Amino acid sequence: MKQLGLLIRLIIGIIAGILIGMCGQWFGIADTAFFVTIIRLLATFTSLFSTFLSFMIPLIILSFITVGMAELGKKANRLFGLTLLLAYGTTVISGLLTFFIGKAVLPGLIQPITGDVLESNAFEPLFTITVDPIFGVMTALVFAFVLGIGMANLKGDSLLNVFRDLQKIVTGVLSRIIIPLIPIHIAGLFANIAAEGRLAATVKMFASLYAIIIVLQLLYILSQFGLASIVCRKNHFKSMKNAAPAYFTALGTQSSASTIPIALNCAYNNNINSDVADFVVPLCATINLNGDTICLVLGSMGIMLASGMNPTFAMFTPFVFMLGVTMVAAPGVPGGGVMSALGLITSMLGFTDPMQQLIIALHFSQDSFGTATNVTGDQAIALIVDKVDRSASEK
């Protein structure tokens, strides 16, 4: 099973969960003790997993954002500042544009799910365990920013190395426990939804969001190369052809970091100065997560609409700006975007545990396309930085 890609395992989990949940209706055993016990066992696993995930979220935020902010601060130079500004700016713009498009399109496609599937829990867990997080999400964010900025201005790396070790521990928990168990977690979620008879509405919501997200990601790639063409005063849409290998590699790896060698070769083929490419491409693999931003903003809006909530501009504007900071500091690894942003989604948008499970499922299911959007956008940013660097050198 581990040899299968994460996307394949996730699809298997969704299908298995649906099949298990539908058995009650298909075979007329919905009210039997055996079927109810199976669903409640899955609900128990989902509950325990959610509790553990809630415990880990502040640690994920603290470790990744603290180290990310500190390391970015220590790299400060002219090219770094420009690259960081472009990455953050395009992330915020992608989030805001996605919000406006979502407000125009989603209400006509997604209706509140009857019976509020996102809150109901007809099949209670057999037992629950309460594990309180070490501190709250916003506390973790503020603490991470203070420590990160502070360590960036320290001469020594002693404290930074402590948090690097913490990051390694958290990364190990993510890669060896949380991410491998996500398919089982999602299977339990969909089994519960199917057993409650609300599968059709949920699948319709997922299909609508999935299609719109991918279209928006592709359009945003075009817009980034359009911006590069304007800034560089040269038609860089042709450069997209050279960037294609990075896009398709990322579809398979689901990791911006793992795609760096291919992305560098693409940058060289686009005649980007090697010094600029060697600096910008690896940096953007960590700080430029536009594809994740589009998914998280639109996915959150869709899930809120399905649960009867109203995603407002006043609610999403601060969320998008905070999400931009979080995405800049998030790791370029599978699931890094949603895991880093989950705290914001919970605290600023009011997501409940079932809603969190759905945004995790949606994000992981399209993570390949989101990552491909990220690495292709990196090429456009590299083109702009290269143009600015050449112009500055000529002066």
Give the positions of each predicted feature.
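Alpha-helical transmembrane segments of polytopic integral membrane proteins
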Residues: 17, 58-66, 94, 98, ...
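Short amphipathic alpha-helical coupling elements at transmembrane boundaries
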Residues: 40-51, 161-176, 242-249, 265-269, ...
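Hydrophobic transmembrane alpha-helical segments of multi-pass transport and channel proteins
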Residues: 52, 88, 92-96, 214-218, ...
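Juxtamembrane helix-boundary/capping and inter-helix hinge elements in multi-pass membrane proteins
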Residues: 69-78, 152-157, 165, 196, ...
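Helix-loop-helix junctions within the multi-pass membrane cores of secondary transporters/permeases
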Residues: 245-327, 381, 389-395
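Transmembrane alpha-helical segments and their short flanking loops
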Residues: 297-395
